[in-house]
Amino acid sequence: ITMKTAFILCLLSLCLSSTSHGQEGKMFTVDKDLSSSMLNKIYQDRDGIIWIATEDGLNRYDGAKFTVYRNEKSNPHSLLNDYVRTLYEDKQGRLFIGSLNGLQIYDRATASFTTIPMYLSSGASIDPNIATILERNNGEILIGTSGHSMFLLETRGDSIKARQISRFISSNLITYAYEDRKGNLWIATGDNGIFRFDKNNQSKHYSGE
């Protein structure tokens, strides 16, 4: 484990312990605690649980112990892929997990994962590489992918799916999406700079050249 990783996790432990019965902070290690030192994202949910997305599994820390989730070939409700890229909790408290080949929601009641079907604009089903997830102020949830541009989450009752949208940008390699205080949507790409969209959906392109 790198010193940077160890330092971050030690700080997280101290932060969590400040609200969990006065526990003392401690250092976490890959050998005993984490599934991997290659961390992609660290997130603390509304219940105080710390989630750590790594290149070898999803780690959950409740203040007392770690639980590691990995893909199980015989279990359709396990992680889609051990390489977890991103995590996002929406306003409803739903925890989304984006991996190398698809999007899932974590079910806290059963400690299992439900895969969200994703469709290209052609109607074909796909399991894309998820790079970023964002809930906008208007309630829209956008999913950026590495290879298939942007998707919009559609929820009807208990049915959830995501469909590709093409109205945004001329790039398939999305790296990050962000909405600022003014409602401007910023989308960073891996091959065509940054795009900004205002509330009227007027765009501006920053190529970096």
Enumerate the predicted regions with their spans.
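Carboxylate-rich, polar loop motifs that coordinate divalent cations or form catalytic acidic clusters
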Residues: I1-E209
